[in-house]
């Protein structure tokens, strides 16, 4: 009887190329935004446009990170899960740049004004809370932290993303004055991803039960 043929594992070169494509895809929006800023194509209010697009890309990448596990399960491509860390770190970078642009360009590092905004403007309060919760996730994203904390504790900490994303959606919704469709769409995507997780969890539990 012939032995079953083993699946050929991707080579290191293939892995490197895929990682390179993921990095390029995550970095491309920032490069395009920088070019548009240099070319004066950010509209009548370039500062607001810059701040908003950085934040929106941060939110998009957070949602992409949450979508990787469902995509890996549905497409039967478990190796996709390896890219969650890279996507998550890029999401943090975009959110950090969003905050830096707001504090540095819009407020000229006026910390007193920032504190007033946090206390008096709900969308700033929610956005700052979401960013503060993102920091420990970015810091503990390495394998070393998984070992130090233990897989269970590390996983519990990183479930904060399930709070961070709705905070980001609410921040965006309260920020916009006219077209609320984008934050509503992002919120709907988040709800769909959470419903999939509930369904998948119940399906897995029913399979494991006697």
UniProtKB/Swiss-Prot annotation:
NCBIfam families given in the database record: PRK05419.2-2
Highest classification ranks of the organism: Bacteria, Pseudomonadati, Pseudomonadota, Alphaproteobacteria, Caulobacterales
Keyword Transcription belongs to the record: no
Transmembrane segments: 15-35, 89-109, 122-142, 160-180
Cofactor annotation remark: Binds 1 FMN per subunit.
Cell inner membrane in keyword set: yes
Cited InterPro entries: Fe3_Rdtase_TM_dom (IPR013130), MsrQ-like (IPR022837)
GO molecular function, one term: FMN binding
Cofactor(s) needed by this chain: FMN; heme b
Official protein name in the record: Protein-methionine-sulfoxide reductase heme-binding subunit MsrQ
A cellular-component GO term for this protein: plasma membrane
Biological process annotations from GO: protein repair
Function of the protein: Part of the MsrPQ system that repairs oxidized periplasmic proteins containing methionine sulfoxide residues (Met-O), using respiratory chain electrons. Thus protects these proteins from oxidative-stress damage caused by reactive species of oxygen and chlorine generated by the host defense mechanisms. MsrPQ is essential for the maintenance of envelope integrity under bleach stress, rescuing a wide series of structurally unrelated periplasmic proteins from methionine oxidation.
């Amino acid at each position: 009887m012939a032995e079953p043929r083993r699946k050929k594992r991707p080579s290191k070169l293939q892995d490197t190329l895929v990682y390179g494509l993921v990095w390029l895809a995550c970095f491309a929006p920032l490069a395009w935004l920088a070019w548009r800023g240099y070319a004066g194509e950010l509209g009548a209010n370039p500062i607001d446009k810059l701040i908003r697009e950085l934040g929106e890309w941060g939110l998009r990448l957070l949602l992409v990170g949450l979508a990787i596990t469902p995509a890996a399960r549905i497409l039967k491509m478990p190796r996709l899960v390896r890219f969650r860390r890279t996507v998550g770190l890029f999401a943090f970078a975009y959110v950090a740049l969003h905050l830096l642009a707001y504090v540095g360009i819009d407020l000229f590092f006026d910390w007193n004004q920032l504190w007033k905004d946090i206390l008096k403007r709900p969308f700033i309060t929610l956005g700052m809370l979401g960013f503060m919760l993102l920091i420990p996730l970015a810091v503990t994203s390495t394998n070393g932290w998984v070992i130090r904390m233990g897989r269970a504790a590390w996983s519990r900490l990183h479930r904060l993303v399930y709070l961070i994303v709705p905070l980001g959606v609410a921040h965006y919704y309260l920020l916009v004055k006219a077209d609320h469709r984008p934050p509503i769409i992002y919120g709907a995507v988040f709800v769909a991803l959470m419903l999939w997780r509930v369904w998948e969890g119940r399906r897995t539990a029913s399979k494991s039960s006697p």
